[in-house]
Design a protein with these regions (language model features):
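Short, flexible N-terminal segments of the mature chain
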Residues: 19-41
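Short stretches within intrinsically disordered, low-complexity N-terminal or propeptide regions
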Residues: 14, 22, 31, 44-45, ...
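Short, mixed-charge low-complexity intrinsically disordered segments
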Residues: 38-87
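Short aromatic-glycine-(Arg/Gly/Cys) micro-motifs in beta-strand/loop hairpins
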Residues: 1-19
C-alpha cells in the first residue's frame, strides 16, 4: 500500500491561477500552510496596513480575507489555502 500525498493549494482572488505543493505528510502540509498564511499576512499588513479576517471554511480549507480601498476602488482580496489527501 502506498502512502498518501498531501497537496497544499493556494488561490488568491487578485491573481490568476493557483499554486500547488505536494507534501509527504498531513502535518507537513499544514505547517507549510501556516507559514504561507503568516507570509501573506505580513506582506499585506506591511504594504496596505490591513489585518485579515481568518475564515475556517471547512476542515481542510482556510481563507484569509483582506478588505481594502486600493486605488480608490473597493477591493476584497481572498486568499484560500486548501489541503487535500491524494491516495
Amino acid at each position: 500500500m502506498t502512502k498518501p500525498t498531501y497537496i497544499l493549494i493556494r488561490e488568491a482572488s487578485n491573481e490568476s491561477g493557483y499554486t500547488a505543493h505536494p507534501f509527504p505528510s498531513e502535518k507537513a502540509a499544514y505547517t507549510a500552510m501556516n507559514c504561507m498564511m503568516k507570509s501573506d499576512t505580513a506582506a499585506i499588513e506591511t504594504t496596505y496596513h490591513l489585518t485579515p479576517r481568518v475564515e475556517q471554511v471547512s476542515n481542510y480549507k482556510t481563507r484569509l480575507i483582506f478588505d481594502a480601498i486600493i486605488a480608490e476602488s473597493d477591493m476584497t482580496v481572498k486568499i484560500t489555502y486548501s489541503v487535500f489527501e491524494v491516495k
